[in-house]
Amino acid sequence: MSEAFNAALSALRALSRKMDVTANNIANSQTNNFKKSRVEMEDVYPAGVKVSISQVNTPGDMLPPDEALPPEERTQNLETSNVNIAEDLVNLIVTEHDFSANIKTIQTKNEMEKQLIDIKV
């Protein structure tokens, strides 16, 4: 297999992981005290793409104690998640375009190989 194919395949795996992490962030955006995760990708020649996932510890907004609860059940202020849904939706769109570009690389490689086989036949 060619280096371009391996690189594109590695990128697809990394982008899939990035989509998983972003989807998890969005799914937990309304969970108090949830800390979002961030995916960082690094080129690693010749293996392809290395994925690192880290937690983002910036604080979320603070909510006052729930006044609807009885006084004995009220706690201190609650912290909301630190997820910015708009930012994560933009990340999903960018990831989708990256995914498409890498799929196109694989398709182009396959078409070139097919043409070479047709020439030899």
Briefly describe each language-model feature range.
Residues 1-121:
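Amphipathic alpha-helical polymerization modules
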